């Protein structure tokens, strides 16, 4: 029971962390891109 709960939490956290990393990288890219103009 605990293992399934842990695997569910890990499977739920992995996409959220990946989306967060892409979001922060996108924001930094937009900021650096806007500063060039």
UniProtKB/Swiss-Prot annotation:
Q: Where are the transmembrane segments?
A: 5-25
Q: Specify where it is mainly localized.
A: plastid
**Which Pfam families has this protein been placed in?**
PetG (PF02529)
Write down the InterPro entries for this protein, in alphabetical order.
Answer: Cyt_6/f_cplx_su5 (IPR003683), Cyt_6/f_cplx_su5_sf (IPR036099)
Task: List localization entries.
Answer: Plastid, Chloroplast thylakoid membrane
Q: Which segments does the entry list as coiled coil?
A: none
Q: Name one GO biological process term.
A: photosynthesis
Topological relation to the membrane, as annotated: Single-pass membrane protein
**Is Plastid among this UniProt entry's keywords?**
yes
Where does it sit, as one GO cellular component term?
chloroplast thylakoid membrane
Q: Does the keyword Ribonucleoprotein apply?
A: no
Q: Which keywords fit this entry according to its UniProt record?
A: Chloroplast, Electron transport, Membrane, Photosynthesis, Plastid, Thylakoid, Transmembrane, Transmembrane helix, Transport
Which Gene Ontology terms cover its molecular function? electron transporter, transferring electrons within cytochrome b6/f complex of photosystem II activity
Q: What top-level branch of life does the organism fall under? A: Eukaryota
Q: Which family does it belong to?
A: Belongs to the PetG family.
Query: What do we know about how this protein assembles, alone or with others?
Result: The 4 large subunits of the cytochrome b6-f complex are cytochrome b6, subunit IV (17 kDa polypeptide, PetD), cytochrome f and the Rieske protein, while the 4 small subunits are PetG, PetL, PetM and PetN. The complex functions as a dimer.
Role, per record: Component of the cytochrome b6-f complex, which mediates electron transfer between photosystem II (PSII) and photosystem I (PSI), cyclic electron flow around PSI, and state transitions. PetG is required for either the stability or assembly of the cytochrome b6-f complex.
| HAMAP family xrefs | Cytb6_f_PetG
Q: What is this protein called?
A: Cytochrome b6-f complex subunit 5
């Amino acid at each position: 029971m605990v293992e399934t709960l842990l695997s569910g939490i890990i499977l739920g956290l992995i996409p959220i962390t990946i989306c967060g990393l892409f979001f922060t990288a996108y924001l930094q890219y937009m900021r650096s891109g806007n500063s060039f103009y």
